[in-house]
Swiss-Prot record:
One of its GO terms (cellular component) is mitochondrion. SUPFAM superfamilies: Chaperone J-domain, DnaJ/Hsp40 cysteine-rich domain, HSP40/DnaJ peptide-binding domain. Residues 395-443 are annotated as: Disordered. The gene is dnj-10. Gene3D superfamilies: DnaJ domain, Heat shock protein DnaJ, cysteine-rich domain, Urease metallochaperone UreE, N-terminal domain. PROSITE patterns: DNAJ_1, DNAJ_2, ZF_CR. The lineage of its organism: Eukaryota, Metazoa, Ecdysozoa, Nematoda, Chromadorea. SMART domains: DnaJ. HAMAP family: DnaJ. One of its GO terms (biological process) is response to heat. This is DnaJ homolog dnj-10.
Length: 456
């Protein structure tokens, strides 16, 4: 790209994709270069945003927002989206500023309206494009997009309307105990600049010239009949706003960010909604309760698992049990088995729509040690020796049990009269040792056996 200097007649070669900046009026002369996406033609800015050249500031801002939702780098990670977002940000920066827009409409970017009769080089964009700064100026909030959720746009600092419903994540403990939460929401309030008058400060509304301040106009029908309709110009107000407020665009209200504090009721369930008033606005907060690692909730009752040792299960004792309002010690009766269910009355969740609290249920689990010390094993064997088993055996006590069974049988045989010795031998069979025979040795002759005995 070459730029003609008309005063000197020289042709200077400019760097591609760098917009030229006019010389500042201060004593220090600097050239602030703007890295643009491409050389835009006169219609390009409008085409980039998808708006007409007659679009007002509100339509341009809305179009920019719709495109930002689609191409912002925090939402769309592709390189094409980054380039597109740079383009729409550049276009919005020019078209949202009245002075820059007038200059752009007059000169374009590649020459004047007649194709080159404008100023040298046509329209040149001044300053550095910071897409985050442009976005911040357009919609408020921080420059970055961290934590920005386009699905909940109305709840964010960048929204065009007040938030009517929002979802809040709370912990299990906050839900059952209650908590105080702070949140930032969008509300529609009177414009801070015009205070709801819709008129630029220093000006007043005038009487509507189309209805003479009546708010209605008369129209004549065929047959000589007349009927009145609402004035389309003033919409029935009877006033004409010649100087609308620039901040609210004559609406009298703007979306403003408010910090509000509210109480989460104790006993809140997952999915419950809370309605409260923020100025003139109603806000519904729906709670998303995170699951607990300790408790399981069933309506107003809570359940928890409690581990006890083998000795506690047999002998009884006390155990520390977690609760929603703090830990407590509970007595464990002697002989408590695993999966025993115990109840603590009134230790559950506070009832939202009635008095009192639910109950807390403990599910006992007896923990059995996998490894024992030598001392512990001897103690367990001594205890096991005193047990009367109906079926089965205990590892480590098999020999003692077999000896006792033999002695019992002998005593029974002595008491029985007329029992023969053969019957006693049959009642006490003795296992014999069997020799293992090789199949090849079974078919050997007499001399082969002698030879094998002598020579091996």
């Amino acid at each position: 790209m070459f730029v003609l200097n008309r005063s000197s007649g020289l042709i200077h070669r400019s760097v591609p994709l760098l917009a030229q900046v006019s010389t500042p009026t201060t004593s220090t002369t600097k050239l602030a270069q703007l890295h643009t996406t491409h050389a835009l033609s006169k219609e390009d800015y409008y085409k980039t945003l998808g708006v007409d050249k007659k679009s007002d500031a509100k339509a341009i801002k809305k179009a920019y927002f719709q495109l930002a939702k689609k191409y912002h780098p925090d939402v769309n990670k592709t390189k094409e989206a980054q380039t597109k977002f740079q383009e729409i940000s550049e276009a919005y920066e020019v078209l949202s500023d009245d002075t820059k827009r007038q200059e752009y409409d007059a000169y374009g970017s590649g020459g004047g309206p007649a194709g080159g009769r404008g100023g040298a080089g046509g329209f040149h964009h001044h300053g550095n494009v910071d897409v985050n700064e442009i976005f911040r100026r357009a919609f408020g909030g921080g420059g970055g997009m961290g934590g920005f959720n386009f699905d909940n746009f109305a709840q964010s600092a960048f929204g065009h309307s007040a938030a009517q419903e929002m979802v809040m994540d709370i912990s299990f403990e906050e839900a059952v105990r209650g908590a105080t939460k702070n949140v930032s929401v969008n509300v529609v309030e009177d414009c801070l600049k015009c205070h709801g008058t819709q008129v630029e400060p220093g000006h007043k509304k005038t009487s509507c010239p189309y209805c003479n301040g009546t708010g209605a106009v008369s129209q004549r029908l065929q047959g000589g009949f007349f009927y009145q309709t609402t004035c389309n110009r003033c919409r029935g107000s009877g006033h004409y706003n010649k100087n609308p407020c620039q901040e609210c665009e004559g609406e009298g209200q703007t979306v403003q960010r408010r910090q509000v504090s509210f109480n989460v009721p104790a006993g809140t369930n997952n999915g419950d909604s809370l309605k409260f008033q923020v100025g003139k606005n109603q806000l519904f907060v729906r709670f998303n309760v995170a699951p607990s690692l300790k408790f399981r909730r069933e309506k107003d009752d809570i359940h928890c698992d409690v581990d006890i040792s083998l000795a506690q299960a047999v002998l009884g004792g006390t155990v520390k049990v977690p609760g929603i309002n703090g830990d407590t010690y509970v007595h464990i009766p002697a002989g408590t088995g695993s999966h025993t269910k115990m109840r603590l009355t009134g230790k559950g969740v506070k009832r939202l729509h009635s008095y009192g609290n639910g109950d807390q249920y403990m599910h006992i689990k007896v923990t059995v040690p996998k490894y024992l010390t030598a001392e512990q094993k001897q103690i367990m064997l001594a205890w096991a020796a005193t047990e009367q088993l109906k079926d089965g055996t205990i590892k480590g006590l098999e020999k003692n049990q077999k000896t006792e069974e033999k002695e019992t049988k002998k005593n029974e045989e002595k008491k029985s009269e007329g029992a023969s010795e053969s019957q006693k031998r049959r009642s006490e069979p003795v296992a014999e040792n069997a020799e293992t025979i090789d199949e090849n040795q079974e078919n050997e002759g007499f001399f082969e056996k002698i030879k094998r005995k002598i020579f091996g």
